[in-house]
């Protein structure tokens, strides 16, 4: 009998839902949510399902999401604490990162109340 190796996680951008999702064996294991403001992608929430905790999926998800932001020519605003923490450890994204300002927080609050 042979053991099946689990498939590598897949990250996809789901524009209608304003988020990136990470899939494991076709099942959504986590997400990072955003709203776009002009040329900036404002990340405000990241979560990984408890069943998938401890596998490094949040890091994979955020790294691939930020790589996609760079490829699209946009900038990052890390309102989400996890994304902010990730960026402190990964300086390769510093050139496309903007600070979180009161103006951005007020705008985001308005977006999320819709």
Q: What would you call each of these model-derived segments?
A:
Residues 2-31, 67-71, 75-77, 81-114:
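Terminal substrate-recognition subdomain of acyl/acetyltransferases
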Residues 23, 44-45:
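Beta-strand residues in well-ordered beta-sheet regions across diverse protein folds
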Residues 32, 46:
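Conserved GNAT-family N-acetyltransferase fold
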Residues 54-66:
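Conserved acetyl-CoA-binding loop-helix of GNAT-fold acetyltransferases
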Residues 47-53:
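A short, internal acetyl-CoA/4′-phosphopantetheine-binding micro-motif in the GNAT/acyltransferase core
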Residues 36-44:
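A conserved beta-turn-beta hairpin within the catalytic core of GNAT-like acetyltransferases
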